[in-house]
């Protein structure tokens, strides 16, 4: 694959992929190669689609009309969190600073993922014995290393660079010790407010959770659409449940760096066709092993780098699954307010479904 340049894409009219090219073959292969992924990174690219200076990527698909339509989905006023509790050290552990902050963190791990480290620390100063009759404040300091497999977090497009570039052709040199100079989380500083749709794949297959390395294919997504009675529309936030947390409760942690259920690479093409704005899951999106030799996480690679599509990793979708099944409604209002941290390549988040 030759390096993709902004000049090349913009000269082609700002859209790297014609509708005819997307539809070629009308199939979603299950035997992609690294060469296929490199080709799709060009063909499916959104670089230049929203202008040469765009940093929002597929968030552009969440229009004012989309937000109004999403608000109309609220009938019961019931809110459901899709986030895990912060992965704090257990009582009695040594705690300690996070990576890059002066030392190694305490060992732990929530539901597994290779790194058995604590991703959060909280230091609090409790009231002293002489403060009973005083008005006193209790303060704490929270630090978090959120990327990885233990914390519900958002990946901004700048979380991944490939061949010296990030989404929309910005150079790798835009990074510094102050973070990402382009494509950071600030493109979502006004919050996310759109229709969310849940793909409950274990319910589709009649199992409590998927196998440890079970792949989800486009055919599964379309079968769930038919069963649940909705269709992904432009601007939708797509959440995919694998049943990870049920599996963790029953069998113990998964090492997500070695083996995890998740989406097969060809699902990116389908998501691009449908106009999804955000992709999230209770795992880290990609099935592992990826089944694409030489490409460890093709979903991450194509979604972040080529589509400019933010990702929500490690969501807890169990309460959402129950709430949706109870109502037989798998579409809902999704709200999410990322922290406004200039240069951040993402951040811990608490996505909320409102029915």
Predicted regions and their residues:
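N-terminal secretory signal peptides and thylakoid transit peptides that target proteins
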Residues: 1-17
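Active-/binding-site microenvironments in catalytic and ligand-binding cores
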Residues: 2, 24-355
């Amino acid at each position: 694959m030759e390096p993709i340049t902004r000049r090349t894409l913009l000269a082609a009219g700002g859209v790297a992929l014609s509708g005819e090219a997307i539809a070629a073959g009308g199939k979603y292969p299950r035997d992609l190669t690294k060469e296929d992924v490199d080709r799709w990174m060009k063909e499916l690219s959104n670089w230049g689609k929203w202008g040469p200076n765009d940093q929002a990527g597929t968030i552009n698909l969440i229009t004012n009309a989309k937000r109004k339509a999403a608000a109309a989905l609220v009938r019961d006023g019931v809110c459901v969190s899709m986030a895990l509790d912060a992965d704090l050290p257990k009582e009695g552990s040594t705690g300690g600073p996070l990576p890059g902050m002066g030392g190694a963190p305490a060992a732990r791990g929530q539901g597994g993922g290779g790194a058995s480290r604590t991703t959060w620390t909280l230091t609090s100063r409790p009231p002293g014995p002489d403060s009973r009759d005083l008005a006193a404040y209790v303060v704490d300091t929270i630090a978090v290393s959120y990327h990885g497999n233990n914390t519900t977090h958002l990946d901004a497009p700048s979380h991944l660079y490939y061949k010296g570039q990030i989404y929309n052709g910005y150079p790798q040199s835009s990074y510094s010790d102050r973070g990402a100079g382009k494509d950071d989380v600030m493109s979502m500083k006004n919050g996310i407010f759109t229709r969310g749709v849940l793909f409950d794949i274990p319910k589709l297959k009649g199992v409590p959770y998927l196998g440890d390395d079970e792949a989800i294919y486009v055919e599964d997504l379309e079968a769930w659409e038919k069963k649940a009675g909705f269709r992904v529309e432009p601007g939708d936030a797509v959440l995919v449940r694998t049943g990870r947390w049920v599996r963790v409760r029953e069998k113990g942690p998964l090492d997500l760096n070695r083996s995890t259920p998740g989406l097969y690479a060809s699902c990116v093409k389908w998501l691009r066709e449908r106009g999804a704005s955000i992709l999230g899951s209770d795992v880290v999106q990609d099935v592992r092993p990826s089944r694409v030799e030489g490409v460890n996480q093709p979903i991450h690679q194509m979604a972040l780098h080529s589509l400019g599509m933010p990702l929500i990793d490690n969501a807890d979708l169990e309460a959402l699954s129950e709430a949706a099944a109870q109502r037989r409604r798998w579409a809902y209002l999704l709200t999410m307010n990322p922290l406004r941290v200039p240069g951040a390549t993402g951040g811990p988040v608490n996505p909320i479904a409102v029915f």
